Regions:
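Q-loop/switch helix immediately C-terminal to the Walker
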Residues: 88, 94-111
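The feature captures the beta-strand-to-loop junction immediately N-terminal to the Walker
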Residues: 37-39
Length: 244
């Protein structure tokens, strides 16, 4: 279970102190699919990065499975089963997909069959990818699904993804949503996804709306999603209905 208690993050600027996150508290039960959404600049990505340890909390606590993570490094949080998928995953020229999966798993003896299972689970034909380099020859959607495969190889209990729909085509996006649906159906991990995408939001068990550094609404999808759609109809949507 993920617990966030009174989390705040402030930065100093020429204009003075800026409150990026303001006293955020929430609880996410194990194996839930939760989407954080809201207007741009509202603090969604900063919240995700704070959970992973990529930005330091000014105050508050981050507790994962009963352990206080607040002062732990990114590496230490990863060792506790927290993983983070970036908007633009890194590429590694000269590094094969199978080697990346072995590194992610912490097992340099990871078998070809095990690598293929991870690739298959994210909708990639293993034979076409296992010996390819993770370089610019791969599309954005392919790299994102390979990144998800590495997170699966880590056997992460909490998977955080920051706008995974960014920069991918329609076909890749359909495969990506299938992958998230599959992960959730297996009930092996908690999914926390930052997204404006209606089709991703519609997969969630729960929706958290963040604006101006605060949680403005939180609840089951069946309760919150109709409100989001109503706002869309009213012409004040921050959602996107498709990808390029």
């Amino acid at each position: 279970m993920l617990e966030i208690k009174n989390l705040s993050y402030r930065v100093e600027s020429e204009e003075g102190t800026l409150d990026i996150l303001r006293d955020i508290s929430l609880t996410i039960e194990d194996n839930k699919f939760v989407v954080i959404t809201g207007p741009n600049g509202g603090g969604k990505t900063t919240l995700a990065k704070a959970i992973m340890g990529l930005v330091p909390a000014t105050s508050g606590q981050i507790i994962w499975n009963g352990k206080d993570m607040t002062e732990l490094s990114v590496t230490e949080r990863a060792q506790q089963g927290i993983s983070y998928g970036f908007q633009q995953p890194p590429r590694f020229k000269g590094l094969r997909v199978r080697d990346l999966l072995a590194l992610a798993s912490g097992n340099d003896k990871l078998t070809v069959d095990e690598c293929c299972q991870y690739l298959t689970r994210v909708g990639l034909c293993a034979g076409d990818y296992i010996d390819r380099e993770v370089d610019t020859s791969l599309s954005g959607g392919e790299v994102k699904r390979i990144e998800i495969a590495t997170i699966l190889a880590r056997k992460s209990g909490l998977m955080i993804f920051d706008e995974p729909e960014a920069g991918i085509d329609l076909w890749s996006f359909a495969k990506l949503t299938d992958t998230f649906r599959m992960i959730h159906n297996r009930r092996e991990s908690t999914l926390l996804i930052i997204s404006h995408q209606e089709r991703i939001i519609n997969l969630a068990d729960e929706i958290i709306m963040v604006a101006d550094g605060k949680i403005t609404r939180q609840g089951p999808k069946d309760e919150i999603f109709p409100e989001i759609l109503a706002n869309t109809t009213a012409g004040c949507s921050y959602m996107t209905e498709g990808v390029s």
